[in-house]
């Protein structure tokens, strides 16, 4: 494994209704990046916020000496689509993702850059002393275990978005066109050398989690359908097992009917209904799982954009930080973009 030269670091942060936390987020992220001794840019993607987040991001990008790039999406597309939009606008040799809620402190960024410079393709993180509620921690552990077994990549905290990706990995992810994706899993599919570091985890200081029960359920289906077809194979095995169990149960009822007469068969009617309802439930569950796969295939076949960027606001060349100017990156202000 050879050292990886890093001249420019991009920090991509998806933002959704984070007006209260943005000033502190910008201040702490810029301070952490200044410690790197490298050129940097902070790409903040507004994912259709309903508060003043987009206005604050644009103002931050337009101020003198700003390293902020504001990417404004026309509506809410979800966290991972917003991150991909940020990837598309980033230019760094190393791209770091970070949540806007400050539960993972930006002060950990230099540690990620240090490990990536050693030659790792992907640097993940493990939340130490996680501050989320139990109903969020336990499903996360189950998902992490399932992902490890399915992908064969032993990373322990796929839910933590504080991660670093080499430029080649980012370009490979952008070349993938499926709509339902989970970035940490997708990245590990292209990475040869990966590692993890333990990072601090704080309670959410502003607002509340954007992941409702329905969003978590949708994320679970994204995980299942984007990483493996194993559930479909299991469904076939379950169907075969149920058919065999049904045949054996019917044979068992026939033997009892012959042994105990017609009166016993009448008493066993409710048992038969219970078994029938159980089989029907499993069938409907299987149909729902098939529907999830077919629905995602339909979305991919339509080939619609995963996101639409309404506008991109960058610092003018005269306002770029000196470190960024030395790296040779310049751009015009408020440039329109296409997905």
Curated annotation (Swiss-Prot):
Enzyme class name: transferase
Transferase listed as a keyword: yes
GO molecular function: phosphotransferase activity, for other substituted phosphate groups; undecaprenyl-phosphate 4-deoxy-4-formamido-L-arabinose transferase activity
Transmembrane spans: 235-255, 269-289
Compartment list: Cell inner membrane
The reaction(s) this protein catalyses: UDP-4-deoxy-4-formamido-beta-L-arabinose + di-trans,octa-cis-undecaprenyl phosphate = 4-deoxy-4-formamido-alpha-L-arabinopyranosyl di-trans,octa-cis-undecaprenyl phosphate + UDP
UniProt membrane topology term: Multi-pass membrane protein
One GO CC term on file: plasma membrane
UniProt keyword Glycosyltransferase, yes or no: yes
Gene designation per UniProt: arnC
Protein name: Undecaprenyl-phosphate 4-deoxy-4-formamido-L-arabinose transferase
């Amino acid at each position: 494994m050879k050292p990886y030269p890093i001249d420019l670091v991009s920090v991509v942060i998806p933002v959704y209704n984070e007006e209260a936390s943005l000033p502190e987020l910008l201040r702490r992220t810029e301070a952490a990046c200044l410690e790197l001794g490298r050129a940097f840019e902070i790409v903040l993607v507004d994912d259709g916020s309903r508060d003043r987040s987009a206005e604050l991001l644009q103002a931050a990008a337009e101020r003198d000496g700003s390293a902020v790039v504001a990417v404004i999406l026309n509506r809410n597309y979800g966290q991972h689509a917003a991150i991909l939009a940020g990837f598309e606008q980033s230019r760094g040799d190393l791209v770091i993702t970070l949540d806007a809620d400050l539960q993972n402190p930006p002060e950990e960024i230099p540690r990620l850059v240090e490990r990536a410079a050693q030659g790792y393709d992907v640097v993940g993180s493990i939340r130490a002393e996680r501050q989320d509620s139990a109903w969020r921690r336990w499903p996360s552990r189950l998902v992490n275990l399932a992902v490890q077994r399915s992908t064969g990549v032993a990373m322990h905290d796929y839910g933590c978005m504080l991660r670093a990706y080499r430029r080649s990995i980012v370009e490979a992810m952008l070349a993938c066109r499926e709509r339902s994706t989970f970035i940490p899993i997708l990245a590990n599919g292209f990475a040869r050398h990966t590692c993890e570091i333990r990072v601090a985890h704080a309670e959410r200081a502003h607002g509340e989690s954007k992941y409702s029960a329905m969003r978590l359920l949708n994320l679970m289906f994204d995980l299942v359908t984007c990483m493996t077809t194993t559930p479909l194979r299991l469904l076939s095995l379950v169907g075969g097992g149920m058919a065999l169990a049904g045949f054996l149960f019917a044979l068992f009822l026939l033997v009892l009917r012959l042994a105990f007469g017609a009166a016993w068969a009448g008493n066993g009617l409710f048992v038969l209904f219970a078994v029938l309802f159980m089989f029907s439930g499993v069938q409907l569950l299987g149909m729902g799982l098939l529907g999830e796969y077919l629905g995602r295939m339909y979305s991919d076949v339509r080939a619609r954009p995963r996101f639409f960027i309404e506008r991109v606001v960058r610092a003018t060349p005269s306002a770029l930080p000196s470190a960024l100017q030395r790296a040779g990156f310049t751009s015009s202000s408020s440039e329109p973009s296409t997905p």
